[in-house]
Amino acid sequence: MLKKLGVLLSAIVLVIASFFVTVTPALAETYTVKMGSDQGLLKFDPPQLTIKAGDTVKWVNNKLAPHNAVFDNSKVPDSVSATKISHKALVFSPGESFTTTFDEPGTYTYYCEPHRGAGMVGTITVE
């Protein structure tokens, strides 16, 4: 009888304890990409970035404005609309920014329209 009572109490304690044990999901992170390097070069800094699905990239106007970040449909995953994630509006003021959250894994190549010819191109890899 005592053995059965001990097993029953142990089971009850385990059930109650399970309510207090939770798995914390990975928190999404925000990464910053500077538009224009600190040295005054026409480039994204960093030019390549690897993030996780659900993370956000914040583009910040740093130097040599104006800048934007535009994606081509041929250089994003098939399930993603380049138009929806592009920021075609130019930013002019230092510190001005915009963000994009990347939900789909894959490789995303983007560029700054005014400075594409100067090589201002970047790549984001979403795992």
UniProtKB/Swiss-Prot annotation:
Known cofactor(s): Cu(2+)
Compartments where found: Cellular thylakoid membrane
GO cellular component: plasma membrane-derived thylakoid membrane
One GO molecular-function entry: copper ion binding
InterPro entries found in the cross-reference section: BlueCu_1, BlueCu_1_BS, Copper_blue_Plastocyanin, Cupredoxin, Plastocyanin, Plastocyanin_cyanobac
Coiled coil: none
Residues of the Plastocyanin-like domain: 29-127
Chief location bin: membrane
Ligand binding (Cu cation): 67, 112, 115, 120
Superkingdom per UniProt: Bacteria
CDD domains the record matches: Plastocyanin
Membrane topology: Peripheral membrane protein
One Pfam family, short name: Copper-bind
Signal sequence region: 1-28
PROSITE patterns named in the record: COPPER_BLUE
UniProt keyword list: Copper, Electron transport, Membrane, Metal-binding, Signal, Thylakoid, Transport
Protein role: Participates in electron transfer between P700 and the cytochrome b6-f complex in photosystem I.
Entry's family note: Belongs to the plastocyanin family.
NCBIfam families attached to this UniProt entry: cyanin_plasto
Protein name (record): Plastocyanin
Source species of the chain: Gloeothece citriformis (strain PCC 7424) (Cyanothece sp. (strain PCC 7424))
